[in-house]
Amino acid sequence: LYITDGGTVVRTPHKILKVHTLPEDVWHGMCETVRNNLPDCDCFIATPDYCLAEDAGSRMFRWLTDSYGYDIREVPDLLKTPVDNVIKFTVYHPSACEEMCAPLFTPTWQTKAKIASSGKEWMDCNPLGVNKGTAIRFLQEYLGIAPDETCTFGDNLNDIEMLESAGTSYAVSNAREEVIAAAKRTCAAYWENGVLQVLKTFL
């Protein structure tokens, strides 16, 4: 079982169990805000099966394909591309996305979508009321697992609800302060294989 795209999709390798989509007018408006007001930022949209962006030669596009292994496809214009199952809109900046979005983008859209930083480069926008925590709770009910039988790990703001939905939760030591405060415990940083160290104790 997999939780993907900030909790918007819960699936097996062959079947989608739960999916939440962004209203078209919301992600279209977000795209226009980025185009018109954030010239140093890029953006892409995600569906349950692939992502779409406008420039295959951009730094963002190459990172998503080369480092993350995304199935991301180039289209000439996101706003003119027929797609009805957008689950996430993401803004990209190479070093300060949250700061770039703070003056206009976030205040404009935070009442219409769940917006959270997922690293210095990314601001993820999900449907309202949808996050990794709602996905964890869906899985707990689906599998008959109690919160006390659940362990989660996180490092960024989009992980907080997930940490709060588990009986045992860890923030890696390099996580943001808000995430460390939300988790019940901490573990070593990701470059020290902190998550793996904890998982080995379960075996």
Regions found by a protein language model. Give the residues of each.
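Short, hinge-like loop/turn segments at secondary-structure boundaries
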Residues: 1, 19-22, 59-64, 132-134, ...
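Alpha-helical substrate-recognition element adjacent to the catalytic core
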Residues: 1-14, 18-24
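Hydrophobic residues in well-ordered beta-strands that form the structural core
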Residues: 3-4, 45, 171
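A short, compositionally biased
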Residues: 4-5, 37-40
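Short, well-ordered alpha-helix to beta-strand connector turns
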Residues: 6, 86-87, 166, 183
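Conserved acidic, metal-coordinating active-site core of Asp-based
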Residues: 29, 33, 40-153, 174
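Mg2+-dependent phosphoryl-transfer enzymes with acidic/Ser/Thr/Gly-rich catalytic loops
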Residues: 124-203
